[in-house]
Amino acid sequence: MLFLVHMIVQIPPDADKAFTDALKAEEKAFSQQLQRDGKWRHLWRVVGEYANYSVFDVGSNDELHELLSALPLFPYMQISVTPLAQHPSAIVAN
């Protein structure tokens, strides 16, 4: 199942820098492992924002929820999810 996920990160401006740096490092390692595992298929930055659009390939809604809620930055994210389906005019199967 493919899902388009929009993530907006909103870390409080007064958050401890050492804490947020460590959190960002954990987030990077975790997200890169999900990419290597084929679960996080695409990751695109939104220009001028601390946000991204991503495509996840997971087995269920519950699996996606578990992955997203396990992200180290999850408590600081606003997330919206859109389920995707193959378009009949697409020349490449997804």
State each model region's role:
Residues 1-94:
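Conserved, structured core segments of small domains
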